[in-house]
């Protein structure tokens, strides 16, 4: 018996399915963790045959990298948009802090996947690493501008890492429901970015 030839997918069809699959996989990875998701479970979520995802993704690792890449792309775009047209370094830092918090609260699944789940070894997925670097670059640039303007002292890369660690810690505590000692997330983030010189 002669098998039926598989239809050749257009670039648009591949892109549309991948976008739908990445959105569904984001929810699944956030709910079940990395080990709790398979391409077959994704197929069930999407209502397609068990083998359909294999036409679009080589394996689960590739799917996960695409989920994280897309999350970092949206996050980086939010950081970029937050400082568009802003020239004052201190204002840029403040707006970046607000954008960071807004993204984490609006997209907790994506935020969890970006920073909390299993990470691939460096050099495995260049596109993912490029978006990660871009998302950090806006904070680094704002800190460097603050150093250049005499508002901050010291190494800009180190200071940017300190600020990132501070806000990430605050946001993570908030999302876990553990900021319960009398200070709100907004108050604490405002303190971090109103007085970035406190980060040593």
State each model region's role.
Residues 20, 24, 28-62, 66:
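Helix-turn-helix
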Residues 1-16, 27:
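N-terminal intrinsically disordered/low-complexity leader segments
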Residues 124-149, 157-161, 186-194:
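Amphipathic alpha-helical packing segments from all-alpha helical-bundle domains
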Residues 113, 141, 145-146, 163-182, ...:
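Amphipathic C-terminal alpha-helical segment
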Residues 17-26, 42, 67-75, 79, ...:
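Generic hydrophobic, amphipathic alpha-helix propensity
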Residues 34, 152, 179-180:
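Conserved hydrophobic residue
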Residues 94-116, 129, 164:
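Helical hydrophobic small-molecule/effector-binding pocket
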Residues 67-94, 124-133:
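Amphipathic alpha-helical linker/stalk segments
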């Amino acid at each position: 018996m002669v098998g039926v030839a598989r239809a050749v997918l257009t670039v648009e069809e591949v892109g549309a399915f991948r976008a739908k699959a990445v959105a569904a996989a984001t929810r699944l990875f956030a709910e079940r963790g990395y080990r709790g998701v398979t391409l077959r479970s994704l197929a069930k979520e999407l209502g397609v045959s068990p083998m359909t995802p294999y036409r679009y993704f080589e394996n689960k690792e590739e799917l996960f990298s695409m989920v994280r890449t897309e999350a970092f792309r949206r996050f980086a775009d939010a950081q970029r948009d937050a400082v568009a047209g802003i020239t004052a370094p201190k204002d840029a830092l403040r707006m970046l802090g607000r954008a960071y918090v807004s993204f984490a609260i609006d997209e907790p699944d994506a935020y969890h996947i970006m920073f909390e789940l299993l990470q691939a070894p460096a050099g495995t997925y260049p596109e993912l690493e490029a978006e990660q670097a871009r998302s950090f670059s806006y904070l680094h640039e704002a800190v460097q501008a603050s150093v250049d303007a005499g508002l901050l002292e010291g190494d800009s890369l180190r200071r940017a890492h300190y600020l990132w660690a501070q806000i990430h810690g605050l946001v993570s505590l908030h999302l876990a429901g553990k900021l319960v000692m009398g200070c709100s997330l907004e108050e604490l983030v405002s303190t971090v970015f109103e007085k970035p010189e406190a980060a040593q």
